[in-house]
Amino acid sequence: MSYFFNPEARVEHLEHVAYYESRQSGLGARYLAAFDAAMVKVCEAPHRYGVEFPPDIRRYRVPGFPYNILYRQVGADIEVLVIAPHRRRPGYWLGRL
């Protein structure tokens, strides 16, 4: 199983990488590694993680970083809807659906 980004989620993801890299050299790469490891787990067993927004939007926390990946299965793939900061209002991204 593979994954793809909602266009707005891709922009957010790249902003997170740039932010961490601007804070400390190599921190952006650590964020990317944590995100990639999270997506490996999601792609291996997408239904293992809890439904955040019914009927099918699930959540997985990026280990070591204050973000949740919200995703859904679309056919044989995973759509990353948002990489949501823990401090941001829940559901701010629902207009993307």
Where are these regions (language model features)?
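Arg/Lys-rich, positively charged N-terminal/basic patches that mediate binding to nucleic acids
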Residues: M1-L32
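Basic/aromatic recognition patch in beta-strand/loop cores that engages polyanionic ligands
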Residues: A37, E44-D77
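Residue-level recognition of specific faces of alpha-helices
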Residues: H16, A34, A38-K41, R59, ...
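Enriched for short, Lys/Arg-rich terminal
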Residues: A29, N68, R72-L97
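N-terminal processing/targeting junctions
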Residues: V11-H13, K41, Q73
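Short, flexible helix/strand-to-coil boundary loops that buttress conserved ligand/catalytic motifs
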Residues: V17, P46, F53, V82-A84, ...
